[in-house]
């Protein structure tokens, strides 16, 4: 069910019965079903700052340019380094490099090489294999052996995930948050399970449906 603002308010079917609530600015504030409840909080710039679920808390922190520079997933803190909006590295809470990313020759979303868990005893490059959309399908180690394998639905929901190495980059080589299943797309968050953004398109660039994913 949708309201007059094209906001999804009720999702039923396939044993699902989920209700959605929004604030006056069009931000998703609550997702509720018989199995779970998620509460979404925002700052004065309509940036998502916190998501609380049944058994998790995720906090998002942003820099002056609006990029998410840090994420707290329960008790784990990860910091990010960007260049022109492109993620180049992940740092741990102490500021030590955990991973650095190397870009390929295609558009910025195509990450072709992941280098390293940067500890002296566990330093190894891994390599991304992408499909025609730029989505990560395989991750190979230095010997060419498959470490990770992914399959996605038409709207980007991960339907198969076989992992031996931690990886944030998934559909369209974008960052998926493990606790929430949302994709961080810089200006907004995308929910692949329903094929919609959690916030309105403030630029009004994608037609009348301000939550649609194109």
Q: Could you describe each region identified by the protein language model?
A:
Residues 195:
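Acidic, glycine-enriched catalytic cores built around paired aspartates
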Residues 1, 20, 40, 59-60, ...:
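A residue-level detector for well-ordered beta-strand positions
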Residues 1-2, 118-186:
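A motif-centric feature for acidic-aromatic and gly/ser/thr-rich catalytic loops and repeats
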Residues 1-12, 17-21, 26-32, 38-41, ...:
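Beta-strand elements of repeat-based all-beta scaffolds
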């Amino acid at each position: 069910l949708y309201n007059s603002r094209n906001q999804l308010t009720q999702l039923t079917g396939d044993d699902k019965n989920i209700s959605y609530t929004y604030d006056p600015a069009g931000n998703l504030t609550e997702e509720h079903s018989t199995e779970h409840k998620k509460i979404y909080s925002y700052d004065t710039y309509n940036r998502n700052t916190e998501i609380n679920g049944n058994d998790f808390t995720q906090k998002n922190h942003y820099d002056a340019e609006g990029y998410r520079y840090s994420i707290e997933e329960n008790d784990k803190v990860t910091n990010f380094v960007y260049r022109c909006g492109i993620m180049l590295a992940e740092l741990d809470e102490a500021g030590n490099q955990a991973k650095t990313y190397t870009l390929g020759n295609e558009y910025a979303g195509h990450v072709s090489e992941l280098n390293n868990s940067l500890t002296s005893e566990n330093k190894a490059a891994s390599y991304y294999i992408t499909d025609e959309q730029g989505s990560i399908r395989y991750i190979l180690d230095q010997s060419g052996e498959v470490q990770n394998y992914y399959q996605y639905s038409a709207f980007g929901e991960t339907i198969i995930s076989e992992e031996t190495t931690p990886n944030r980059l998934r559909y369209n080589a974008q960052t998926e948050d493990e606790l929430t299943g949302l994709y961080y797309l810089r200006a907004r968050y995308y929910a692949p399970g329903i094929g919609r953004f959690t916030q309105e398109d403030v630029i009004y660039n994608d037609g009348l449906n301000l939550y649609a994913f194109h």
